[in-house]
UniProtKB/Swiss-Prot annotation:
Lineage: Bacteria, Bacillati, Bacillota, Bacilli, Lactobacillales
Organism (species): Levilactobacillus brevis (strain ATCC 367 / BCRC 12310 / CIP 105137 / JCM 1170 / LMG 11437 / NCIMB 947 / NCTC 947)
Summary of the function given for this chain in its UniProt record: ATP-dependent specificity component of the Clp protease. It directs the protease to specific substrates. Can perform chaperone functions in the absence of ClpP.
ATP-binding keyword on record: yes
Keyword annotations: ATP-binding, Chaperone, Metal-binding, Nucleotide-binding, Zinc
Protein name as annotated: ATP-dependent Clp protease ATP-binding subunit ClpX
Annotated SMART domains: AAA, ClpB_D2-small, zf-C4_ClpX
Taxonomic superkingdom: Bacteria
Key word Transcription present: no
Pfam families: AAA_2, ClpB_D2-small, zf-C4_ClpX
GO BP terms, alphabetized: cell division; proteolysis involved in protein catabolic process
Residues that bind Zn(2+): 13, 16, 35, 38
Residues of the ClpX-type ZB domain: 1-54
Self-association state and partner proteins as the record states: Component of the ClpX-ClpP complex. Forms a hexameric ring that, in the presence of ATP, binds to fourteen ClpP subunits assembled into a disk-like structure with a central cavity, resembling the structure of eukaryotic proteasomes.
Length: 418
């Protein structure tokens, strides 16, 4: 900083008009002067604007109890999993907000905790992750691990997962960097059993290795148009440090691994009461999966290490599926009731009909995921005929409508009036 002494007359600040005598210092530039008071004022304005921006970037995170309360409106059952996920998500976004403040804190650095969700097909893994993103109002993307291969082989690069998130954030990189990515079928990239084959495992262990960096946190180069990367292509850089990764899979056969670990071969002498209790309770084996079981299943240690939070979903029973059909905020039965109401027709499902649909889903081993196709099959002919009729006031779905494709019971308008 320097004072101008070469100009004729008193030097004044170009911004406030004060002279040298009225301020401590005046800084000169090409044809312009600024005093120390205006410099301080400019700094205050910039700091205030920066703090406002930081505040805007801070996510409003509901408490774990509030997250579970909202999840209960959409997801039936899975109480333990919902509690685990709500705490994990709450802590993750507390960490994100703390990092956004950029405070000079000498305390411990909070590390990211990604989540692994184990559960049978149709138990709600994807829907839970999707619901969490909706509650937090952050971008969300779903990826299928079976489509991924390591770089240089036919298939998708792992960076394409980030592209989906970026697209769902409308190419807003800052929003994408705070999103949630759910990678499904993660059990399908377990490394193959040791054998004499010299073929490289490009869709198993190779993909696990390729995912390590983005799970942990790295600056990834994402091709904006997708596809394979090539040297002439421009990239969008995404920092994955604050992206929450949730991976899920059915892990068929892992119950056997848990059972062996808990002492399946020591029935009677040597088996403690806790082991016997677990072994006698079927589905509860899933609740006792530990990282060592995932290692034996075929996930590599480095990959497991980046998924410190592990939770399991129980297989849905008949009662759960009936509740899923009727209770959630956007339950399928409520959706079809609304569809028919738009044609001024009431829709009623007899309780026994709902149970038959639940039994069908269990028989097909599709869980909650298969309920939509079942109810769509039941309703298809009804929804085809009804718009052409003006005499129907109410449709009643019976068990026979579900099991035998029998005609539903119709209540006509003149019958209802009488």
């Amino acid at each position: 900083m320097f004072e101008n002494t070469e100009t004729e007359g008193p030097v004044t600040c170009s911004f406030c008009g004060k002279t040298q005598d009225q301020v401590q210092k005046i800084v000169a530039g090409p044809g312009v002067y600024i005093c120390n008071e205006c410099i301080d004022l400019c700094k205050e304005i910039i700091d205030e604007e920066f703090n406002q921006t930081a505040a805007q970037e801070t996510l409003e995170v509901p408490t774990p109890a509030d997250i579970v309360k909202t999840l209960n409106q959409y997801v039936i059952g899975q109480t333990e999993a919902k509690r685990t996920l709500s705490v994990a998500v709450y802590n993750h976004y507390k960490r994100v907000n703390e990092m956004a403040q950029e405070t000079d804190d000498d305390g411990p650095e909070l590390q990211k905790s990604n989540i692994a969700v184990i559960g049978p097909t149709g138990s709600g893994k994807t829907y839970l992750a999707q619901s969490l993103a909706k509650i937090l109002n952050v971008p969300f993307a779903i990826a299928d691990a079976t489509t991924l291969t390591e770089a240089g082989y036919v298939g998708e690069d792992v960076e394409n997962i980030l592209l989906k998130l970026l697209q769902n954030a409308d190419y807003d990189v800052d929003r994408a960097e705070k999103g949630i990515i759910y990678i499904d079928e993660i059990d399908k990239i377990a490394k193959k059993a040791e054998n004499v084959s010299i073929t490289r495992d490009v869709s198993g262990e190779g993909v696990q290795q390729a995912l390590l960096k983005i799970l942990e946190g790295t600056i990834a180069n994402v091709p904006p148009q997708g596809g394979r990367k090539h040297p002439q292509q421009e990239f969008i850089q995404i920092d994955t440090t604050n992206i929450l990764f949730i991976v899920g899979g059915a892990f068929d056969g892992i119950e056997g691994i848990v059972k062996r670990r808990l002492g399946d071969q020591t029935i009677g002498f040597g088996a403690d009461s806790q082991e016997q209790h677990v072994l006698s309770s079927g589905d509860s084996l899933m609740q006792h999966v530990i990282p060592e079981d995932l290692l034996e299943f075929g996930l590599i240690p480095e990959f497991i290490g980046r998924l410190p939070i592990l939770t399991a979903l129980e297989k849905l029973d008949e009662n759960d599926l009936v509740r899923i059909l009727t209770e959630p905020k956007n339950a399928l039965v409520k959706q079809y009731e609304k569809l028919l109401a738009l044609d001024n027709v009431d829709l009623q499902f007899q309780p026994a009909a709902l149970r038959e649909m639940a039994k069908l889903a269990i028989a097909r081993n599709t869980g909650a995921r298969g309920l939509r196709s079942i109810i769509e099959d039941v309703m298809r002919d009804i929804m085809f005929d009804l718009p052409s009729r003006t005499d129907v006031a109410k449709v009643v779905i019976t068990p026979e409508t579900v099991t035998e494709h029998a005609e539903p019971e119709l209540v006509l308008k003149d019958q209802k009036a009488s």
